[in-house]
């Protein structure tokens, strides 16, 4: 199982994804309210077996919230939690800008377009 997350300015969404890429659970909460205690309560209701998690990846535009979630999940799963911006993306996409200055949400949109077998329309309201 994988944990995937999107931390936006308003909302944070966390998904539990099966190995065949199906979303099995979704958790949504207000980003500004996040802290260790709230995460503990949310994940109790999420009913997740942390031993089954083998990868964690987040797309975040709020570094402070990502650090709180990363600390929580790393402690629970003993797995390193990655943020899209911190991955080596040069082999996936080439852009004429500093990757650190481009939002994670924009980078993931661009990466999704590299699949040349399908047509895409990406709507980004962020």
Model-derived features with residue positions:
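Alpha-helix C-terminal capping segments
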Residues: 43-48, 76, 113-117
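Phosphate-binding/catalytic loop of phosphoryl-transfer enzymes
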Residues: 80, 92-126
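Short beta-strand-loop/turn "lid" adjacent to the catalytic site in phosphate-handling enzymes
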Residues: 49-102
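Short hydrophobic/aromatic-rich motifs at helix boundaries and adjacent loops
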Residues: 14, 42, 81-84
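Gly/Thr-rich phosphate-binding beta-strand-loop-beta motif of the actin/hexokinase/Hsp70
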Residues: 1-24, 113, 117-126
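N-terminal phosphate-binding loop and adjacent alpha-helix
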Residues: 23-68
